[in-house]
Structures are given as structure tokens and as C-alpha cells.
């Protein structure tokens, strides 16, 4: 289905249909996705070899929150924002993306794992919280 996040060239790509999931806000567009990680990624001190997950969002304006905590981009240029070492917890994580008014048409994104590509295939991504009652 064209709604599924898919692996290509060592990236977990946002599908084209993701644009249809954007919700209008007062100052732009918002998307919540739910990312399942088989292991916690939030404590690099314990395990130096832990997968380092990156999210790249194609948008001129972007804000990210992970499990409702704001998370800063390491870089933001005219075309995209890059978020590194996402502190996902083990299990399902809410990833909230906000983009600007003019960003909807170009909007896309991908997850990368610079140090352990094989980790990407163990992630799951959904649009609806699978744990919501």
C-alpha cells in the first residue's frame, strides 16, 4: 500500500500518502506517527554501539517532539531539518512533526541509522497509536 513506510537505500522512507495524514493547525500542519523500537535508544552511555537513529524532514519550518517532549534539530536549512540520535524508548513512541503553512506539498521524510543500517528493518511505524484503548 502507498501508505506504508518502506525501506530503500538504507533509509526508512515516508510514503507519498503521508501528506494526506497532515492535520491543519493555526500556523501550519501537524503529523503524529507512532514508531516501535525493539530496544531503548535513549542511553548512549550504557552501550556505545547502540543504534543511532536520525530523522530527516523535508520542510522549511519544522518542530519535532518525541513522546511529547520537544527535540531540537542539529541542522535546519531552507529545505530540510535533521534530527540525530532520537531518544526512542523500547516499545511504541509518539513522534510529532509540525511543519509550516507552505511546507505541505514538498513534505516528506526518512529515518536513517548511520551506524547500524540493519536496525531500520526492526522499526515499525503506524499512524494510529496501537496501544490506545
Which residues does each predicted region cover?
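Short, solvent-exposed beta-strand-to-loop segments that form ligand-recognition rims
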Residues: 71-79
Amino acid at each position: 500500500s502507498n501508505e506504508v513506510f518502506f525501506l530503500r537505500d538504507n533509509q526508512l522512507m515516508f510514503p507519498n500518502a503521508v501528506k494526506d495524514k497532515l492535520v491543519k493547525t493555526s500556523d501550519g500542519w501537524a503529523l503524529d506517527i507512532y514508531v516501535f523500537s525493539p530496544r531503548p535508544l535513549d542511553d548512549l552511555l550504557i552501550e556505545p554501539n547502540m543504534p543511532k537513529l536520525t530523522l530527516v524532514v523535508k520542510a522549511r519550518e519544522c518542530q519535532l517532539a518525541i513522546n511529547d517532549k520537544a527535540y531540537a534539530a542539529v541542522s535546519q536549512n531552507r529545505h530540510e531539518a535533521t534530527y540525530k540520535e532520537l531518544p526512542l524508548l523500547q516499545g511504541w513512541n509518539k513522534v510529532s512533526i509540525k511543519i509550516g503553512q507552505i511546507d505541505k506539498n514538498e513534505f516528506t521524510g526518512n529515518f536513517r541509522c548511520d551506524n547500524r543500517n540493519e536496525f531500520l528493518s526492526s522499526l515499525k511505524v503506524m499512524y494510529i497509536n496501537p496501544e490506545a484503548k
